Each structure stands twice: as structure tokens, then as C-alpha cells.
């Protein structure tokens, strides 16, 4: 059991080292910028927050919408607790 744990830890360490070295190589080639990583994540989170919108039927006589509609997300996302979640 200890052998398997040691193998798993070493494998994870090798994968992390490989990932970091690959990221540094791409950064050195100006393929990615370090600040772009966080900007992309923030944009995705903002899209999730605002993508979940409340849709409702407008009455024929022109009255404003009431809360009888349903929440919808676009692009294959589903609304869970007012956030769009990808399933």
C-alpha cells in the first residue's frame, strides 16, 4: 500500500513539473501572457453570472412581465441557484 502511495505522489509531482515547464516554455515564446490567464477566468465567471436570465411571457394587453416565467441559460448551460452551470 505504501508503494502505491509513493508511486502516486511521484507521478503527480512529475506531472506538475512537466506542466510548469511547458507553461514556462509557452510564456517564453510569447504564446501566453501570465496576466491573460486571470483575465480569461474572470471573463468566464462574469459570463456565468450574467448569462442566467429570467424569461417571462409578456401579457397580450401590454402589462409588464410577472414572475411566472422560468430562468434560462444559453449555449448548453443550465440554471442552478441563479448561476449557469455546464452539464
From Swiss-Prot:
Q: Signal among the record's keywords?
A: yes
GO molecular function annotations of the record? ion channel regulator activity; toxin activity
Major site of localization recorded for this protein: secreted
Q: Where in the cell is it found?
A: Secreted
Positions of the pro-segment in this chain: 24-51
Gene Ontology CC terms: extracellular region
Arranged from A to Z, the UniProt key words for this protein are: Disulfide bond, Ion channel impairing toxin, Knottin, Secreted, Signal, Toxin
Q: Which InterPro entries match?
A: Hwtx-2-like (IPR012625)
- Protein's name according to its UniProt entry: U3-theraphotoxin-Cg1c
Job description of the protein: Probable ion channel inhibitor.
Amino acid at each position: 500500500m505504501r508503494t502505491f502511495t509513493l508511486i502516486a505522489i511521484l507521478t503527480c509531482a512529475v506531472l506538475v513539473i512537466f506542466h510548469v515547464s511547458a507553461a514556462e516554455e509557452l510564456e517564453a515564446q510569447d504564446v501566453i501572457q501570465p496576466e491573460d490567464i486571470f483575465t480569461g477566468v474572470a471573463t468566464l465567471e462574469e459570463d456565468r453570472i450574467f448569462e442566467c436570465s429570467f424569461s417571462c411571457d409578456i401579457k397580450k394587453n401590454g402589462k409588464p412581465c410577472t414572475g411566472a416565467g422560468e430562468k434560462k441559460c444559453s449555449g448548453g448551460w443550465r440554471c442552478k441557484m441563479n448561476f449557469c452551470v455546464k452539464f
